[in-house]
């Protein structure tokens, strides 16, 4: 039994399971999105965090259920991305949220994560003449604020727009997803049949012993590296909504993850402020079929903090 084995031996076994999962297809390509403070206002067509959206001439910002304009939290100019098989090759993908949500949730509906009443994901296939009157997010800093930038009592709002640079990376299997423990546990029992973990139960209370064993096995290998990205795996600070909402388990594509950042590691003199509550993160997920059809009406959006 595992109780009688040295920890180093158990750790080697756990590492072997993770390596097996990655070899069998768990590794995913991701594109890291690195924010930077632009020296001058970015073009409306540029990839960016926050800022002024590139809306077609005559087009207005999407609105919440009260008819109030949403604020753009991110815009991806697909042609600027490194070569990938996730995003369209051209066009703009925009992510909008409610800057004046009375519950300070910025449009996240924890009872229905795909409800786009107060958030929106919009894809423009072609770039035409932009609407010069496209607004910046209209943020009520006395209430919920906004993840991008901040507010100084003397100078007012700080940067509400950051540029993006891109870096192709690869992510191995991560503990963040709802099915991680199930996948790891099944592979462990298959690989080490004489050292099986406590039996799995649908009842979460009866499953506690197995969950605790899985946590102890995998905790040493959890990555502490957090970065905004498209593709790869989402990063859930708290719970993966797909665990509760089984109808979302087909949402396997990570359309976008934005994490909290309070500094620029490459330039200490450049202040970056992206903050989801208390150092949280946000994720947008989609099904492969909807993405292939360029249908962004059924995207799951969630954010949470520590």
Predicted regions and their residues:
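Preference for intrinsically disordered or flexible, low-complexity segments
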Residues: 1-306
């Amino acid at each position: 039994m595992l109780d009688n084995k040295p920890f180093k031996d158990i750790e080697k076994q756990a590492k072997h399971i993770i390596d097996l999962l990655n070899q069998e297809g768990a590794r995913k390509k991701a594109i890291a999105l690195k924010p930077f403070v632009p020296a001058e206002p970015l073009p409306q067509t540029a990839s960016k965090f926050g800022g002024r959206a590139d809306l077609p001439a005559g087009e207005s910002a999407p609105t919440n259920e009260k008819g109030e304009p949403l604020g753009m939290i991110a815009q991806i100019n697909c042609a600027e991305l490194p070569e990938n098989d996730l995003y369209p090759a051209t066009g703009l993908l925009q992510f909008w949220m409610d800057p004046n949500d009375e519950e300070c949730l910025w449009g996240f509906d924890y009872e229905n994560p795909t409800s786009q009443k107060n958030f929106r994901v919009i894809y423009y296939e072609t770039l035409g003449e932009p609407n010069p009157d496209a607004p910046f997010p209209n943020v009520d800093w006395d209430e919920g604020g906004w993840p991008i930038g901040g507010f100084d009592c003397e100078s007012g709002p700080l940067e509400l727009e950051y540029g993006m640079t891109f870096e192709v990376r690869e992510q191995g299997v991560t503990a963040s997803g709802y099915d991680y423990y199930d996948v790891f546990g099944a592979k462990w029992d298959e690989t080490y049949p004489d050292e099986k973990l406590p039996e799995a139960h649908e009842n979460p209370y009866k499953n506690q012993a197995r969950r605790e064993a899985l946590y102890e096995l995998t905790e040493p290998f959890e990555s502490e590296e957090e970065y905004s990205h498209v593709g790869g795996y989402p990063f859930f600070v708290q719970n993966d909504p797909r665990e509760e909402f089984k109808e979302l388990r087909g949402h396997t594509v990570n359309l976008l993850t934005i994490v909290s950042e309070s500094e620029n590691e490459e330039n200490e003199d450049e202040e970056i402020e992206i903050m989801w509550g208390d150092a949280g993160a946000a994720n947008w997920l989609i099904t492969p079929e909807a993405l292939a059809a360029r249908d962004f009406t059924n995207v799951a959006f969630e954010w949470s903090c520590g």
